[in-house]
From Swiss-Prot:
This is 2-isopropylmalate synthase. Catalyzes the condensation of the acetyl group of acetyl-CoA with 3-methyl-2-oxobutanoate (2-ketoisovalerate) to form 3-carboxy-3-hydroxy-4-methylpentanoate (2-isopropylmalate). Residues 392-522 are annotated as: Regulatory domain. It is found in: Cytoplasm.
Length: 522
């Protein structure tokens, strides 16, 4: 048996079922092209019979994608198969995926037929799909709850009818790994023509076991895993592609299996899907979460600096990230602070380590996470633990034209003790406020991240805005709190402005320090 596991991505079909709004054809094509770069073997991109929009997107993707096999879903109905075949006909290579329910509860309650009638429908559908392509996949919906005798009969009949891939879904995420592995093993033991098809699995995450069940299945002979980027999908989601890919890569020595996935594209693809689908990835998500390669514990950080594999079983570079993050918090040791200062270009003779670490701990207790620019300021500025509020927002007034979408903002800001008033327009109230603040401060920064949240519950909650901005090729993080979202946004920007002002002072100090070195000074 081959040790190659086929990766069947269904982000654009099953994954899209989790979205509040459908993706546009252009957005689906963007994701499809990213999946092609990622190296998925098969991508299921829609359900053509369901709507003209889905038909168009399947056809557009089928026409464009060359290096992955494009697949479309159909029920075990001729009209569904016709629509799938027509949409896919423009592709160089394609697959028709047809399915029918096989569990007793589905057969009796949903289909209202006998199992024998359902089996006949499945056989007819597979034979009909084979008129259009040799690559036909058949799925036994709710296989995880199907009586094993019935499942074996269905699989044997579908293979005999011409299916070259047989998919065994745990549609409602009900099984546990030992149980699901037994199902796969039983199929291999009892279905006489099983060697004529690839056995696939499609596991849902209702009990959080989709990845574990999928790995167990390939250990028992399955050779295709159906999955989605970031694990998105109906209800609790699907098996996560990035987790499967990195499990098989990281544990190749034990599992003896491999995929064709280009792992360095994982991070980029995850971000794209998250943004286009408007589904943020939870910070502690395996592989692609913001904290996946972040270390805050002082003991862990010290170990990481000595040898990365003390606390990392894979590298961030392996999924396309530049490096891991050592969050500087009150739990960070002196070794971490010294390491960060060295990375920023400072030798231990440039600052007083004892004084710096003492002030660092004070600031970390006060604000939680300390950033590089904080550390520089602590090392070289007076009143080290206090932020230099060169800019202070005094007043913000916003007027918005709901019909045109143009807003006007007027701000009064104290700039180094001098009061300045400026007005500006923008595409919405937040944009207008930002433009007015930029005018008043005469300081331009690029916002690369804007996150809106809340502090508190109900009517008493405060709007919290977190922004990340780039200034002189360095990232700065600002936070604003207010009952009004626009005001919170303005306060976050002013926070960043103060940080950049302080960074400029640090840069001037560094420059003078460098001149003293060159002149032989202390």
């Amino acid at each position: 048996m081959s040790n190659r596991v086929i990766i069947f991505d269904t982000t654009l079909r099953d994954g899209e079922q989790a979205l509040a709004a459908s993706l546009s054809v252009k957005e689906k094509l963007q994701i499809a092209m990213a999946l092609e770069r990622l190296g998925v073997d098969v991508m299921e991109v829609g359900f053509p019979v369901s709507s003209p929009g889905d038909f168009e997107s399947v056809q557009t993707i089928a026409r464009t994608i060359k290096n992955s096999r494009v697949c479309a879903l159909s029920r075990a109905l001729e009209k569904d198969i016709d629509a799938a075949a027509q949409a896919l006909s423009v592709a160089d290579q394609f697959r028709i995926h047809t399915f029918i329910s096989t569990s007793t509860i589905h057969v009796e309650s949903k289909l209202k037929r006998s199992f024998d009638q359902v089996l006949e429908m499945a056989v007819s559908a597979v034979k009909y799909a084979r008129r259009f392509t040799d690559d036909v996949e058949f799925s036994c919906e709710d296989a995880g709850r199907t009586p094993i005798d019935n499942l074996c009969r269905m699989v044997e009949a579908a293979i005999l009818a011409g299916a070259r891939t047989i998919n065994i879904p745990d549609t409602v995420g009900y099984t546990v790994p030992s149980e699901f592995g037994t199902i796969i093993q039983t199929l291999f033991n009892r279905v006489p023509n099983i060697d004529q098809a690839v056995i696939s699995v499609h596991c849902h995450d209702d009990l959080g076991l989709s990845v574990a069940n999928s790995i167990t299945a390939v250990q028992h002979g399955a050779r295709q895993i159906e999955c989605t980027i970031n694990g998105i999908g109906e209800r609790a989601g699907n098996c996560s592609l990035e987790e499967i890919a990195m499990i098989l890569a990281t544990r190749k020595g034990m599992l003896g299996l491999e995929t064709g996935i280009n792992a360095k594209e994982i991070h980029r693809t995850s971000n794209l899907v998250s943004q286009l689908c408007n589904m943020p990835v939870q910070a502690n998500k395996a592989i692609v979460g913001a904290n996946a390669f972040t270390h805050s514990s002082g003991i862990h950080q010290d170990g990481m600096l000595k040898a990365q594999n003390t606390y990392e079983i894979m590298t961030p570079e392996s999924i396309g990230l530049n490096r891991n993050n050592l969050n500087m918090t009150s739990r960070s040791g002196r070794h971490v602070i010294k390491h960060r200062m060295e990375e920023m270009g400072y030798s231990e003779h440039d600052y007083n380590m004892d004084a710096l670490y003492e002030e660092f701990l004070k600031l970390a207790d006060k604000k939680g996470q300390v950033f590089d620019y904080d550390l520089e300021a602590l090392a070289f500025m007076e009143a080290q633990a206090e932020e230099d509020n060169h800019y202070q927002l005094q007043q913000l007034v916003v007027q918005s034209d709901s019909t045109e979408g143009v807003a006007t903002a007027t701000v009064r800001i104290e700039v180094g003790g001098e009061i300045k008033t400026e007005a500006a327009t923008g595409n919405g109230p937040v944009d207008a406020a930002y433009n007015a603040i930029a005018r008043a401060t005469d300081r331009r920064i690029d916002i690369i991240s804007y996150k809106l949240g809340a502090k508190g519950v109900g009517q008493n909650a405060l709007g919290q805005v977190d922004i990340t901005a780039v200034y002189h090729e360095q990232n700065f993080h600002g936070v604003g709190l207010a009952t009004d979202v626009v005001e919170a946004s303005a306060r976050a920007l002013v926070h960043v402005m103060n940080l950049t002002c302080r960074a400029d002072k640090v840069a001037d100090y560094k420059q003078s320090m460098q001149k003293n070195r060159e002149l032989g000074g202390v």
